[in-house]
């Protein structure tokens, strides 16, 4: 079955999840360093408030944190981390599939281009995607999405012995006592 967005769906642009656990808070859309400046520039030129936090960092020595950031994350505009700030939820215009329009669709991050293909072992389709929920089978036309994921993986490959993950401190009010902020060494 060929992958296509489900009619009227924008779920992947709205709902963010805790990853890898609630402790780390909700994750934003993965942004590579070379994408960060373009996204910040677009937001500034269109008077959009965005929050970009670090996501993955590396170091060659065990220290208090990373020396280089290899990935960032674009956080949602709601206090709980949900809803991409580039998702136009106020316009009456809709995308070809009937969902909300993306203000940066032509220049969206590789992570958005890769979706619903996600990094797992083995690479899979995101089970939370409405298309994947309803079809339950592997889509046959996800070559472009797979290529985007491969580009991300290639750009994040490192020989650094220490990899750090950033806890966003962002999540639902009901989880606020469990969520932390700051860098954590991956073990």
Region annotations inferred by a language model:
Residues 1-187:
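Short loop/turn segments that flank or connect secondary-structure elements
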């Amino acid at each position: 079955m060929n992958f296509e967005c489900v009619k009227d769906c924008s779920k992947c642009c709205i709902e963010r999840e805790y990853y890898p656990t609630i402790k780390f808070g909700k994750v934003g859309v993965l942004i590579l360093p070379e994408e960060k400046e373009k996204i910040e520039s677009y937001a500034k030129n269109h008077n959009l408030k965005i929050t970009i936090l670090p996501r993955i960092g590396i170091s060659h020595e065990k220290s208090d944190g990373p020396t280089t950031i290899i990935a960032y994350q674009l956080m949602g505009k709601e206090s709980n981390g949900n809803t991409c700030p580039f998702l136009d939820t106020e316009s009456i215009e809709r995308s070809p599939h009937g969902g909300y329009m993306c203000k940066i669709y032509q220049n969206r991050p590789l992570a958005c281009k890769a979706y619903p293909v996600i990094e797992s072992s083995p690479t899979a389709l995101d089970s939370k995607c409405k298309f994947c929920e309803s079809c339950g089978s592997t889509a046959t036309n996800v070559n472009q999405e797979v290529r985007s994921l491969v580009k991300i993986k290639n750009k994040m490959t490192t020989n650094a012995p220490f990899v750090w993950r950033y806890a966003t401190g962002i999540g639902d009010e009901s989880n606020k006592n469990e969520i932390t902020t700051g860098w954590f060494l991956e073990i």
